[in-house]
Amino acid sequence: MVQNKFHYAITGRTAAEIVFTSADRSKEHMGLTTWKNSPDGRILKSDVNVAKNYLSQKQIAQLERTVSGYFDYIEDLIERENTFTMEEFSESINEFLSFRRYDILKGKGKISNAAATKKAHAEYKEFNKTQKIVSDFDREIKQLKAKNT
């Protein structure tokens, strides 16, 4: 839920909504902007259900700044020996995001994580059939040829 609050603040969509609406086998790199072995490596099934992998560089930078700012805020409160219930912790996120003039997620979002994962994996199954596979052998040959020229 915490992650969704930040994703929603930056994109207007929860993590599941980002994955569900962005995973598309017909798009270059299946709609991903980054993945474990990017930019030249193979896209893995585990890459396609990570919402952050679909965000633009600008959105990633905003997300990182916002999360970092929130952690600084919480660390300051903890150093002053404030304690929180989970409900208070959740509300503190809303207060922080509201102060930063972001929209606040109400509820859990429209798409479940299970539905997003199911769609992303179905898209990946078809996309994976078209992925170009470069073997280690081919990669080594290419490097050797480059050295000899």
Q: What does each model-identified segment do?
A:
Residues 1-149:
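Positively charged, phosphate-engaging catalytic surfaces used for nucleic-acid and nucleotide handling
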